[in-house]
Structure formats: C-alpha cells, structure tokens
C-alpha cells in the first residue's frame, strides 16, 4: 500500500518510535498514525508491527474452538454448553454400553490393558485425521507436558478398563461419579483453588454414598473383588489430576483438542505397548482377539470411535468452562449409564444402590449449587419456618370461617 497517496488529505501525522538501551535487545517498534479526514470527525489508529516482529499464523483463530470440524466459537456460551452436553451424553452413553458389552465376551475380562492399547491406537489415528484440515499443525504444548498427560491418561483409562474384570459395571461407574473429590484435591494442590462449605459437604456426601454403594455391591455381586476397588480408586486419582493439567496446558498454550488427543494418546500407546511387551501380556491377548475379531476388534472400533467423539466434547467443556463443570456434566452422564446398565444387562439389584446413589448425586447437586449461588437461591431455614407458620395460620383461619 502506497502510504504517500493515502496521506494526501491527512492534516497531522505523528510517528513515535521508542528504543531502549543499545545493549538490550531491540524491542518491537510501533508506528502509530492518527489520521483525521477533512469532512469527518472520525479518527483512525493504525499500528504497524516492525519487521522483527513475528506474526504467528494461528493468531487470527486464537479464540476458535473447533470440535469434530464444528466451530463452537460462532455460538454464544449457552449454546456452546448445550452442544457440548448433548455430545457428551449421546456418545458416552453408547460408549458405556459397548464397554460393558465387550467385557461380557467370555474370557475377555483379563485383557483390559490390551483393549486400552487398541483404544489408544484408534484415538491416535482419529486425532491425526482431525488435525489434517488445520493449517497450523505445530505442536504448542511442550513435549514434557504431553509425556505427563499421556502417563495420567494411561493410568486413568487402563486402570478403569482393567477394573471391570473385578467389579460390577455400576460399581465402577459410581466410583467415577465421585471423581469430584480428587478433582477438588487436585484443584487445591495444582492450581491453588479454595473451596467453600458447600463443596466440602458435597465431598462428604459423595464419600458416604460411595462407601454405602460399595458395601451393598460386596454383599450381592458375585464378581466383587477388592482389587477392582483399588484399581478404580487409582484411576480416579489419575483422572482428577489430568483434568486440571489439561485445563492449565490448553489455556496456557492455546492448544486445539485434536492436538491434545493426538499427542497424549499416541505417547500413551507407546507406554502401554512397552508395558505389555515387558510383562508378556501382548501375545495371549492378540491370540484371543484373533479368534473373535468381530466381537473384539469390531466392538473396540465402535467403542473407540464413540469414546473419541465424547472426549472431544469433554475437552471442549474443559477449555470453555473449566474442569469442574466438565466433571459435573460427565457425572450426570454416568448416572444415565448406570440406569441403562441395569436395563440392558442382567445383574443383581438392591435398593441400597438407589439410596447410596441418591446420596452421591446429592453431593453433586451441592457442588453445582456452590458454583451458582448467585443464580440458584434456595430458601433459608428461617424462611421455611415462617412459611410453615403462615400456612398453619391460614388453615386455622379457613377452618374458623
């Protein structure tokens, strides 16, 4: 653009350049021109970066949040929330059904780590495919951070899948519902967050409900094993940490969901492959799955596909609304999964499941309420007493009349 021709009608041109000491590195010079037109009262401020300033090609889309090719940044916050919630529920409900279906295959329960290996392989492929349309394919999060995230992801999904060989599926899910407890602990130690009385009460309710549910399951479930409780508890701890680490890394480096999935799961695939090779667990698993390819690899593909779509929406929730909101949404989805599990798969049932589950969800409600006290106003105890007294007076008056 010829600046001489553009400045013919300009009355004032101000050029300011600032340089620091010669010994210091030259900072980005800024040329600011105030253009005042004769027949207009408007002022135009133009900032021209110097040649030394590098312009990253992803700056224009720094706020773009793309999930499965859909740009959520075009929608308002409420619409973004409902889209993410719908995606989480639809895909993860199918995911949960397929997960229990795979472990219902006779003889498969001891191959939970191999299922995780196949799942990570599919996730890596899906992430690579989703990354192709993006022009800027540079990795933004440091490799060391991805190694940590991959390790936590392996712990979360591997231990969770393996625990199904020892636990009833609803018991595993109810443990996952209590992920808010370690998430809160992770928020305190990793991000320095502080929680109020409602959050602490929520944690207590969930803990008591979890203990009650586990005791009920141990009395009636034929395949209950304490090893499964240990495995799923370790998975919860890893899951609590990973949510906070992902939130911190994605917001700090402005990484895309597809990048997060590709690198964390591909590195995790290497971890699991090395682990299975060293423990001689790879050969028997491959032999077993080769005998039942449709019911193993076929189910695993659909299981991984729905899980990948679901995790994409979960990562979007984390990036937009934070880890705690994302966990709350996924917890509601798990409640639906428990109901569907009892409907589609035969298993023993006791009403202690219901009461303990309600106690857990009471804790979840308290946690959500603590984050939305300005929007959700519950009546105080004093208000409830006054209302009951007024109701009694009105009844007495009505009877007198």
Swiss-Prot record:
It holds the Pfam family UAA. It is found in: Golgi apparatus membrane. It is a multi-pass membrane protein. GO terms for cellular component: endoplasmic reticulum membrane; Golgi membrane. It comes from the Eukaryota. The keyword Membrane applies. Keywords: Antiport, Glycoprotein, Golgi apparatus, Membrane, Transmembrane, Transmembrane helix, Transport. GO terms for molecular function: 3'-phosphoadenosine 5'-phosphosulfate transmembrane transporter activity; antiporter activity. The chain crosses the membrane at residues 78-98, 111-131, 147-167, 170-190, 200-220, 223-243, 267-287, 298-317, 324-346, 349-369. The keyword Transport applies. Glycans are attached at residues 12, 71, 254. Probably functions as a 3'-phosphoadenylyl sulfate:adenosine 3',5'-bisphosphate antiporter at the Golgi membranes. Mediates the transport from the cytosol into the lumen of the Golgi of 3'-phosphoadenylyl sulfate/adenosine 3'-phospho 5'-phosphosulfate (PAPS), a universal sulfuryl donor for sulfation events that take place in that compartment. This is Adenosine 3'-phospho 5'-phosphosulfate transporter 2. It comes from Pongo abelii. The lineage of its organism: Eukaryota, Metazoa, Chordata, Craniata, Vertebrata. The gene is SLC35B3.
């Amino acid at each position: 653009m010829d600046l001489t021709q553009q400045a013919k009608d300009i009355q004032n041109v101000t050029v300011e350049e600032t340089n620091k000491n010669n010994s210091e590195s030259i900072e980005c010079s800024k040329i600011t021109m105030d253009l005042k037109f004769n027949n207009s009262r408007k002022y135009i401020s133009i900032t021209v970066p110097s040649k030394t300033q590098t312009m990253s090609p992803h700056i224009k889309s720094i706020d773009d949040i793309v999930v499965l090719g859909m740009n959520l940044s075009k929608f308002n916050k409420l619409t973004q929330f409902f889209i993410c919630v719908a995606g989480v529920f639809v895909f993860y409900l199918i995911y949960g059904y397929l997960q229990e279906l795979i472990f219902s295959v006779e003889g498969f329960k001891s191959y939970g780590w191999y299922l995780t290996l196949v799942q990570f392989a599919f996730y890596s492929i899906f992430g690579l495919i989703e990354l192709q349309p993006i022009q800027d394919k540079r990795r933004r999060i440091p490799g060391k951070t991805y190694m940590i995230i991959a390790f936590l992801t392996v712990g979360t999904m591997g231990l969770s899948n393996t625990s199904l060989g020892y636990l009833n599926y609803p018991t595993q899910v109810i443990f996952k519902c209590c992920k808010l407890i370690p998430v809160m602990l992770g928020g305190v130690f990793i991000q320095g967050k502080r929680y109020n009385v409602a959050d602490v009460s929520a944690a207590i309710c969930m803990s008591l409900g979890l203990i009650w549910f586990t005791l009920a399951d141990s009395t009636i479930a034929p395949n209950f094993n304490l090893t499964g409780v240990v495995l799923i508890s370790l998975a919860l701890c890893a899951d609590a940490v990973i949510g906070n680490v992902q939130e911190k890394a994605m917001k700090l480096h402005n990484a895309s969901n597809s990048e997060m999935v590709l690198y964390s799961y591909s590195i995790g695939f290497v971890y699991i492959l090395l682990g299975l090779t060293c423990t001689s667990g790879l050969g028997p698993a491959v032999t077993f799955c080769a005998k039942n390819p449709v019911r193993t690899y076929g189910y695993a593909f659909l299981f991984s596909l729905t899980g990948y779509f679901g995790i994409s929406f979960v990562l979007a929730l984390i990036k937009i609304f934070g880890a705690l909101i994302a966990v709350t949404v996924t917890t509601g989805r798990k409640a639906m999964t428990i109901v569907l599990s009892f409907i589609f798969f035969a298993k023993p049932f006791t009403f202690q499941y219901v009461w303990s589950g309600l106690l857990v969800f009471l804790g979840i409600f308290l946690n959500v309420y603590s984050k939305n006290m300005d929007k959700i106003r519950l009546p105080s105890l004093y208000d409830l007493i006054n209302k009951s007294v007024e109701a009694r007076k009105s009844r007495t008056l009505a009877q007198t009349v």
